[in-house]
């Protein structure tokens, strides 16, 4: 039997901290996960500007703190993470670290190959509030980057799926 990863939190980065084949992206959404053994994983969803607003992102933006680093209570809305992911969930994966101090190592990263469209205005709103909040591009340090042949497993660990984080 597989195991679950719990979504612990979502972070946004402007610009995206990842590059694919040298191409950079304006923004990314990082889904941070932890399994029952305490192992960390993160799914990076690259965001690209388009003409239309992304409803999932807009639900989050409706509750975004207007002052940097100001804590905000989670919105009283249900978010379906599947709505934030591209239809084709092919990915790259590697062992890396968290991108904020203390930059803990041992994080399994999944970078989705296919970006998700958001409006230029949605990127602009975040960029004005949180300009350049991403970690500089890091050297690969001989990390092995693997490419999927299909969609992400139901759980990044190959287990049964995601579950919401327990109430605190």
Regions found by a protein language model. Give the residues of each.
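Extracellular or lumenal secretory-pathway regions
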Residues: 1-26, 30-168
